[in-house]
């Protein structure tokens, strides 16, 4: 399982540990990923995704999973999130 947020595409970054003597050693910065069940209002069920805490706050800020998926570009979303996005769009078009 890769360490990438399924909603924002946020992944690992590479940088340096810098000691007091200014010695630099390579290190990775991993995103804070959580397995979360987000409720879709349009589908009426929960969707389990692996989301960064930043992504979780962004979803809540926009007003829920459905709004987030419809406003986000497809390139940023994982295949699982794209599948949910298509289901939500189909459900909203039928309503």
UniProtKB/Swiss-Prot annotation:
One of its GO terms (molecular function) is structural constituent of ribosome. It comes from Zymomonas mobilis subsp. mobilis (strain ATCC 31821 / ZM4 / CP4). InterPro entries: Ribosomal_bL28, Ribosomal_bL28/bL31-like_sf, Ribosomal_bL28_bact-type, Ribosomal_bL28_sf. The keyword Repeat does not apply. The lineage of its organism: Bacteria, Pseudomonadati, Pseudomonadota, Alphaproteobacteria, Sphingomonadales. GO terms for cellular component: cytosolic large ribosomal subunit. This is Large ribosomal subunit protein bL28. One of its GO terms (biological process) is translation. Belongs to the bacterial ribosomal protein bL28 family. Keywords: Ribonucleoprotein, Ribosomal protein. HAMAP family: Ribosomal_bL28 (MF_00373).
